[in-house]
Amino acid sequence: MTVVNLAYIPSPPQGVWHLGPIPIRAYALCIIAGIVAALIIGDRRWEQRGGERGVIYDIALWAVPFGLVGGRLYHVMTDWQTYFGAHGKGIGKAIAVWEGGLGIWGAVALGGVGAWIACRRRGIPLPAFADAIAPGIVLAQAIGRLGNYFNQELTGGPTTLPWGLELFYRRSADGTVDVLNLNGVSTGEVAQVVHPTFLYELLWNVLVFVLLIVVDRRFKIGHGRLFAMYVAAYCVGRFCVELMRVDPATQFGGIRVNSFTSTLVFVGAVAYILLAPKGREDPATLGGTPSSADGGDDTAETEATADTEDTEDTEDGVTDAPEADATDKSVDESADNSGIVEK
């Protein structure tokens, strides 16, 4: 008989539903919801800073796909044995991002490359964009952590604390029973009660979101320093959470790889905060250029045509003026010769 402590947090009975043959995964829905929230918040903040509304969505067309690819690459690279080891899941599972597994550092790094490309095309300073989107990113991470809750993953060791998370055995369609069965449905039997480390990180991310908003409003942070503050603050929380996690991960000297990454990135973020210019960018620099390269070329061509016409008019004026003077002089001479005088 299974004894259930009502004080514990129960896991969801399942993390995937089916709409006919199409699987609807809670993890994917959480990722999408996080991205939408980040874009809405980022767009409003960009407009408040003096930028054009809607620009954030244009940049996202580059940044989001790059970020998803980068996040998955980082996850696979730091968990190589799971996919390509002796008993690995294979390349099919390696690209199945909808089943969970995104590394934030890869997402930020490659997403930053996509954002840089888009900002360069629009003539927008990348640091200003990063500051506008930073609070939205950390909130998106918090929302995304809910996906780990549905997957019963990213947890810590056993605990008897009242906020411990109950992990249920799940049975898949083929009858397989396992705690980490992403496609299964709960049997109702509790396998163990553990630290919900994903929840700890979720709460930390929400706190960082609030702090970034408050600090930015009070001190008018710019030039990429607010984004660096987000990175530094996130690293602190991630480092602490990594110390509590017990799920399999690549380690160096008994330390999880994400702990090393968090430390190095934290140092870099703090250095940037100290060295970057103070204050905020001039709103006039956030206007950028039209999103369409063709539109920009048409504008330039129109201006060039106008300049050419002005030049031709000037040249015609210089050439025609002497001819007009000569004609007037000829008429005057004819009038004098004929004795005609105006009275």
Curated annotation (Swiss-Prot):
Its main location: membrane. It is an enzyme of class 2 (transferase). A 1,2-diacyl-sn-glycero-3-phospho-(1'-sn-glycerol) binds at residue 145. Residues 283-343 are annotated as: Disordered. It is a multi-pass membrane protein. Pathway: Protein modification; lipoprotein biosynthesis (diacylglyceryl transfer). Residues 295-325 have a biased composition (Acidic residues). GO terms for molecular function: phosphatidylglycerol-prolipoprotein diacylglyceryl transferase activity. Its EC number is 2.5.1.145. It is found in: Cell membrane. The chain crosses the membrane at residues 22-42, 54-74, 97-117, 123-143, 193-213, 257-277. The keyword Lipid metabolism does not apply. GO terms for cellular component: plasma membrane. Keywords: Cell membrane, Membrane, Transferase, Transmembrane, Transmembrane helix. Belongs to the Lgt family. Catalyzes the transfer of the diacylglyceryl group from phosphatidylglycerol to the sulfhydryl group of the N-terminal cysteine of a prolipoprotein, the first step in the formation of mature lipoproteins. This is Phosphatidylglycerol--prolipoprotein diacylglyceryl transferase. It comes from Mycobacteroides abscessus (strain ATCC 19977 / DSM 44196 / CCUG 20993 / CIP 104536 / JCM 13569 / NCTC 13031 / TMC 1543 / L948) (Mycobacterium abscessus).
